[in-house]
A protein has these predicted regions:
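Catalytic-core segments of nucleotide cyclases and related cyclic-nucleotide turnover enzymes
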Residues: 9, 70, 114-121, 125, ...
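A structural signal for short, well-ordered beta-strand segments
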Residues: 53, 101, 137-141
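PAS-family sensory domains
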Residues: 1-5, 158
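PAS-associated C-terminal cap
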Residues: 4-14, 18, 30
Length: 172
């Protein structure tokens, strides 16, 4: 009988998976991790009820990059990720695009989400007050509703619509 210790290989594989699923700038889940989460949920339909998502979009990241440089833009992205993470502690957070984030709201109630959004707004205001530009995070959320949604895709589309409505209100 030959026994081989594969502990190091297992740990290395786990470390590579964590690295593969993390956004290098913010440390939150990346688009690949987000897509894996959605694939998992779609292949386990019993997990879909109760699913919810908060879509977040940073206001004027391109303008910040153009006017103040990419270092300042990167700081804006990192600080925004921290703000979102602090407003929704323990909730999975993903950066799915340059200025787009998604929070998985499973297990949270309407009141918790509202409190999280308010905390986010206060933190963004404090960040803006001490900065050379006006930071902003537009956010919209939706929970899976069997009366409205045929899939998680339609739940995400509703959250995205609410986020763009908020973004429009913030600009006007």
């Amino acid at each position: 009988c030959v026994v081989e210790d594969v502990t190091d290989e297992i740990l290395e594989t786990k470390a590579l998976k964590v690295e593969r699923d993390r956004d290098g700038l913010t440390g939150v889940g990346n688009r690949l991790a987000y897509e894996h989460m959605l694939q998992h949920k779609n292949s386990h339909p019993e997990e879909i009820p109760g699913s919810g998502f908060l879509m977040c979009d940073l206001n004027d990241l391109k303008g910040v990059n153009d006017r103040f440089g990419h270092d300042k833009g990167d700081e804006y992205i990192r600080r925004s990720a921290d703000i979102i993470r602090e407003a929704f502690p323990g909730a999975p957070l993903f950066r799915i695009g340059g200025d787009e984030f998604v929070v998985q709201l499973d297990g949270l109630g309407q009141e918790q989400v509202t409190r999280g959004i308010l905390a986010m707004e206060r933190a963004v205001k404090a960040y803006s007050d001490g900065n050379v530009f006006a930071a902003g995070i537009a956010a919209g959320y939706a929970f899976f509703d069997p009366g409205k949604d045929v899939s998680l895709g339609s739940t995400l589309a509703r959250a995205d619509t609410y986020m763009y409505r908020k973004k429009h209100k913030m600009k006007h």
